[in-house]
C-alpha cells in the first residue's frame, strides 16, 4: 500500500539500511579451485567505513552517508542529510516521508529514537523485523554497489574509500535516472 501511495505522489517512501565497506579488496564472484583460500595480499591493516543510506522508492535515488563507525551518531548524520533533501522547506508544499528501517541497534538506540521523534511532524518510520533483508529494497542496491563498484580494489586509506563510496553512489544514481524519452506520449 505504501508503494502505491509513493507512486501516486502522496508520500515519499524511503528504504533505509546500513552496511560496511573495507579498505582491503572484497572478492566478489571470483573463481578458485574448490577448497582454495582466496586471499589477495594487501598493504597495512584493513579499515572499515560504515555506509548508512536510503533509497527513494519512486526515483530510485540512493543517498549515502559514510561514517567511521556504525553507531547512532552516523545514523543521525544520515537523518540530517535526509532533512536537507526531504524535510519541510518554507514556501513549498511538504509531502510526508515514510522511512522503512530494520530494528537494528543503531536505529533503536535512545539517541536515534530522540532524533526520529524530533522529525515526527514530517517523517514517520515503519519498522521491519530485525535482520529481515527481503522486504527492504535497498538491500539489492547495496549489494550492487559493493559487488560492482567497490569490489576487487584496495584503497590507500579510509578517505579514499569514502570518496569511492560517494562516487559509486553517484554512478548508481546516474544509471538509475529515468530517461525522459522512455515513455513517449502522443500529443493531442
Model-identified regions with their sequence ranges:
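Extended, low-complexity cationic-aromatic segments
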Residues: 1-81
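C-terminal anion-handling pockets and recognition modules
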Residues: 10-11, 138-188
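The start of beta-strands in P-loop NTPase/AAA+ ATPase cores
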Residues: 12, 96-97, 124
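Structured catalytic cores of enzymes that bind and process phosphorylated ligands/cofactors
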Residues: 14, 81-92, 166
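Acidic/histidine-rich, metal-coordinating catalytic segments
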Residues: 16-17, 79, 91-108, 131, ...
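RNase H-like polynucleotidyl transferase catalytic core
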Residues: 37-44, 117-138
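Distinct, well-ordered alpha-helical segments
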Residues: 110-114
Amino acid at each position: 500500500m505504501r508503494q502505491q501511495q509513493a507512486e501516486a505522489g502522496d508520500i515519499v517512501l524511503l528504504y533505509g539500511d546500513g552496511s560496511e565497506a573495507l579498505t582491503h579488496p572484497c572478492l566478489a564472484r571470483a573463481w578458485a579451485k574448490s577448497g582454495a583460500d582466496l586471499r589477495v595480499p594487501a598493504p597495512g591493516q584493513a579499515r572499515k567505513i560504515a555506509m548508512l543510506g536510503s533509497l527513494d522508492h519512486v526515483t530510485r535515488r540512493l543517498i549515502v552517508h559514510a561514517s567511521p563507525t556504525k553507531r547512532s551518531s552516523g545514523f543521525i548524520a544520515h537523518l540530517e542529510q535526509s532533512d536537507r533533501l526531504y524535510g519541510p522547506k518554507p514556501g513549498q508544499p511538504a509531502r510526508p516521508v515514510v522511512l522503512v528501517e530494520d530494528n537494528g541497534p543503531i536505529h533503536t538506540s535512545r539517541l536515534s529514537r530522540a532524533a526520529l521523534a524530533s522529525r515526527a511532524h514530517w517523517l514517520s518510520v515503519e519498522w521491519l523485523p530485525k535482520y529481515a533483508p527481503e522486504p527492504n529494497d535497498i538491500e539489492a542496491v547495496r549489494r550492487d554497489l559493493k559487488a560492482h563498484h567497490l569490489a576487487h580494489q584496495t584503497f590507500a586509506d579510509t578517505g579514499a574509500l569514502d570518496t569511492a563510496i560517494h562516487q559509486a553512489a553517484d554512478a548508481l544514481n546516474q544509471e538509475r535516472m529515468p530517461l525522459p524519452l522512455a515513455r513517449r506520449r502522443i500529443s493531442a
